[in-house]
Amino acid sequence: MKNMLHPQKYETHVLDDLMEFYEGVIGYPEIDLRLAGEEAWLKGVNPELAEAVKKIIKTIRRYLEGSPYDGSEKPIPRYIIAEIFSQIAPEVQLLVNALDTEGKYGFLKHIKKLNLNSLAMLSKNYNENDKLWKELENEGYVYLE
């Protein structure tokens, strides 16, 4: 029975759902509901990945439950999406390691990227020509819109 459940199907669905969330195709609580379904299926075939999905769900809830974007048609701001994805990077990496993604999931390249816009707003000494900021850009960090 265990082999008949096709665990890769559920791992792939989690990444598909996260990609749609990242791209703004789906919002909250839809992402929560989708991931909860995938987590339930993964419990039977790969408890480690099910636990990773559970952590992803909890992180997304922490940011969005009860927020102005909870159940509304308002798009979730990019800086919130970026922060969520920076927090779930280790769990997403577990899913990626379990699959051969072949570059299908473009959002993965942004998961570990620092949102320089947010950091710049927090810095009292921000200067876009500053050596530190140029070094961060050269290392692949990006300004998210």
UniProtKB/Swiss-Prot annotation:
GO cellular component: a single term: virion component
Annotated InterPro entries: RIP_P131-like
Statement: the UniProt record of this protein carries the keyword Lipoprotein: no
Coiled coil: none
Region listing for C-terminal tail, binds in the RNAP DNA-binding channel, in residue ranges: 110-123
Conditions for induction: Not detected in early stages of infection (in Acidianus convivator), strongly up-regulated at 72 hours post infection (at protein level).
Major location category of this protein: virion
Function, as annotated: Plays a role in the inhibition of global transcription by interacting with the RNA polymerase (RNAP) clamp, locking it in a fixed position and inhibiting the formation and/or stability of the pre-initiation complex (PIC). Also overlaps with the transcription factor B binding site; overall RIP probably interferes with DNA loading onto RNAP but does not displace DNA once it is loaded. May play a role in virus particle assembly, possibly by dissociating active RNAP from the virus genome.
Protein name, UniProt field: RNAP inhibitory protein
